[in-house]
């Protein structure tokens, strides 16, 4: 909320302040396998440091593919295949966001997803390099589809729900989840990462 620089990548100046995130992505698409990133997260509450795979599809209501999604009722079936590691976050054990927790998510589409809140062995806002990894298994006749999530070599969680199948691009980025209007101005300014009360932060 304290950022006063140029607006980049968005087209609005909101009363709560200017928020400009950033992301990089691979040009190529990659399928199931082991994904590992060594990174220092942005060490401030209010911004989400994220590592994710993403593949996006839209199917018009008149298309054959639309019929594969009978729970969709709009003009388009929007399908986003995604695997996420996001920090910081809050979970049932914490009233406020903390770097002692992360979100591990798997998506087949917005209403077919699993979000898991995981306590970490140690806080990761210590300015040190940490290794974030997920092993993506799409499964076969002998193996159940799953995603195994690791931090610093320790397996912390396995998701068996809504496991993506198509090849995806790998993304690294920082963004600002806003879900609660804490100051009553009509705009969400405090999300599950906290309030963004800083000028700049680096992931």
Mark where each language-model region is.
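GH16 jelly-roll
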Residues: 1-203
């Amino acid at each position: 909320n304290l950022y006063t620089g140029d607006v980049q990548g968005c087209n609005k100046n909101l009363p709560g302040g200017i928020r400009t995130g950033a992301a990089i992505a691979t040009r190529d698409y990659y399928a199931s396998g082991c994904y590992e990133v060594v990174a220092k997260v942005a060490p401030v509450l209010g911004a989400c440091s994220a590592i994710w795979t993403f593949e996006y599809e839209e199917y018009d209501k008149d298309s054959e593919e639309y019929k594969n999604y009978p729970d969709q009722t709009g003009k388009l079936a929007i399908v986003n295949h995604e695997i996420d590691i996001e920090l910081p976050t809050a979970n049932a054990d914490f009233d406020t966001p903390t770097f002692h927790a992360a979100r591990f998510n798997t998506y087949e589409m917005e209403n077919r997803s699993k979000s898991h809140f995981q306590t970490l062995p140690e806080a990761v806002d210590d300015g040190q390099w940490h290794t974030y990894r997920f092993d993506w298994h799409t499964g076969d006749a002998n193996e159940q589809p799953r995603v195994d999530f690791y931090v610093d070599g320790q397996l912390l969680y396995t998701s068996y729900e809504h496991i993506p199948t198509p090849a995806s691009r790998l993304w690294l980025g920082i963004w600002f989840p806003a879900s609660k209007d804490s100051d009553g101005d009509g705009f969400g300014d405090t999300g599950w990462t906290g309030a963004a009360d800083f000028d700049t932060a680096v992931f």
